[in-house]
Regions:
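Transmembrane helical cores of multi-pass secondary ion antiporters/exchangers
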Residues: 1-418, 422, 429, 437, ...
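Soluble N-terminal domains of membrane-associated systems
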Residues: 442-454, 460-528
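Long, amphipathic alpha-helical stalk/connector segments used for oligomerization, subunit docking
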Residues: 407-468
Length: 528
């Protein structure tokens, strides 16, 4: 199997793993990792050599951008303290603990190389956290914190990693210089992210066409990452800043086509890139195994020790961190935004899977130092890193669904439905208010006014059928039944129209572009 065919298999696997994972109640990223491991059987696939300097720039920007689209600035600020405790403080603590243990158990491992190992295994993967948490029906507050942690911990870890690698390669280290580098990297990244977000927002207003606007959103994450890296800033933080800016300001209320099509396009991108990323993790396993070269027992022992450190440090940190977060938020009346039970804390602890970023950083370790000597214990670091990635991703990823079901941690569906219902009522009332405003300045026929009033009510019923239940209780049962009947008949009429247009594709002389254009009109009409 050549590399092109292998890439195609990963793409197909990315699509198939979603329904298979839903049936098996297993996260799709874990299934893709297992597929990569199966494909990595010696002799079945070629030795896949992926340039490490391309993994982060190619995979992370779209994945991070897609993840940020599911959150908001309000959610981020509401969970700021818990996120900082996990995404910044915990990364530092995990790096220090892993470095200390690795320096003690791996003979001759320099402290700078040990810190590099600690930094690359410290951050839970944002893609794994988002993909796994999103499929398990976890409470929104818990998902928000996991997503926030996953999105921002890479920034801290990557800067620590670069500082440690520079120290190991040059043989010298300066804490003041490292601190200055961290601050400058963050400042440059935020500046680039805001500037590109503002420019992209203005350009989207200028383009107007939905196809071009969506195409621009596909390019913006890469532009943000590359520009920040060229200016010695954090590409990851720049992408996050740009995505948050555009999520708040990019699309107006009337950008319907861009919003509908954009969600579909980004769902496809997210599914495919996530699948390929985790498939590559499994494929890289055979490269890590080759580095053991007869020292299986010893190196597996080192990897197991680091896995234990990573898992235990997260637990020991989370217990006081969640207590502190509860105290802080209680004073600001934000209790609903943080884990309030020990069950949710346990789920958060077991959700610390490592993934794409750790793989990229492990593969990016240089081969030589400035003096031309081999990088100290590079093979050992790579093997230990992949041991941690596989143990956390596969073991925790496979057992997390069982743990969630066992503990009974799930989203409050009743509260979500009530919120959806309240929004539906607000939307319908806003439509009615606007109709009254128009009637004050325009004279509308009574029949038209009544029809428009029914449409305003139907807006609420379409969003949340429970709005109709309320109307029924208020004595409007007949009107609700008539509206639902009309919707059913209109749906059947539009279905017949679509079938007729699709049949025209196979008629002699039919212009497929015209057929598609008419079909798009019918599709949009069906969504109303």
């Amino acid at each position: 199997m050549d590399q092109l065919a292998l890439f195609f298999v990963l793409l197909v696997g990315a699509v198939v793993s979603v329904p298979v994972g839903e049936r098996l109640k297993l996260p799709a990223p874990v299934l893709m990792t297992l597929l990569g491991i199966a494909l990595a059987v010696p002799g079945f696939v070629p030795n896949v050599e992926i340039p490490p300097e391309l993994i982060l720039p190619l995979l992370l920007p779209p994945l991070l951008y897609a993840a940020v689209r599911r959150t908001s600035w309000r959610q981020f600020t509401a969970n700021l303290r818990p996120i900082l405790l996990l995404a910044v403080a915990l990364v530092f603590v995990t790096t220090a603990a892993v470095a200390a243990v690795a320096n003690a158990i791996v003979p001759g491992l320099p402290i700078a190389a040990a810190v590099a190992l600690g930094a690359l295994v410290a951050p839970p993967d944002p893609v794994a956290a988002t993909a796994v948490a999103g499929q398990l029906g976890l409470p929104r507050r818990l998902v928000s914190i996991l997503e926030g942690e996953g999105l921002f911990n890479d920034v801290t870890a990557i800067v620590l990693y670069h500082v440690a690698i520079a120290a190991a390669v040059s043989g010298s280290f300066s804490w003041p210089r490292a601190a200055l580098q961290l601050v400058l990297s963050a400042v440059v990244a935020v500046a680039v992210g805001v500037a590109l977000g503002w420019a992209a927002n203005k350009l989207m207003d200028f383009l107007e066409d939905a196809t071009l606007q969506i195409g621009l959103t596909l390019l913006v994450p890469y532009a943000s990452y590359v520009m920040a890296e060229e200016l010695h800033g954090s590409g990851v933080l720049a992408v996050l800043t740009t995505a948050l800016f555009l999520a708040e300001y990019a699309l107006g209320a009337d950008d319907v086509l861009t919003r509908l099509a954009g969600h579909t396009v980004w769902d496809v991108v997210d599914t495919l890139v996530t699948g390929v990323a985790f498939g590559l993790i499994g494929l890289e396993l055979h490269n890590a195994i080759r580095t053991a070269s007869g020292r299986w027992g010893e190196m597996l022992g080192w990897a197991a020790a680091v896995v234990v450190v990573v898992v235990l440090v997260r637990l020991v940190w989370l217990l006081p961190a969640t207590w502190l977060a509860r105290r802080w938020h209680a004073k600001r009346d934000y209790d609903e935004e943080i884990p309030m039970s020990w069950r949710e804390t346990v789920v958060m602890w077991w959700s610390g899977m490592r993934g794409v970023a750790s793989v990229a950083l492990a593969l990016a370790i240089p081969l030589e130092t400035e003096s031309g000597a081999p990088f100290p214990d590079r093979d050992e670091i790579v093997f230990i890193a992949f041991g941690v990635i596989m143990a956390t991703l596969v073991l925790q990823g496979l057992t997390l669904p069982w743990l969630v079901r066992r503990l009974g941690v799930r989203a409050d569906e009743g509260a979500e439905k009530e919120f959806e219902k309240a929004l539906a009522v607000r939307a319908a009332k806003a439509a009615k208010r606007r109709l009254k405003e128009i009637e004050e300045v325009e004279e509308l026929p009574e029949e038209m006014s009544e029809r428009l009033l029914r449409r305003a009510f139907e807006i609420g019923v379409r969003i949340s059928p429970e709005v109709g239940e309320d109307e029924r209780r208020e004595g409007h049962e007949q009107r609700v039944r008539r509206l639902r009947r009309m919707r059913r008949i209109q749906g059947e009429m539009l279905s017949a129209a679509r079938h007729e247009v699709l049949a025209a594709r196979s008629e002699p002389g039919a212009n497929p572009e015209v057929v598609d254009r008419v079909l798009r009109h019918l599709d949009v009409r069906s969504l109303r």
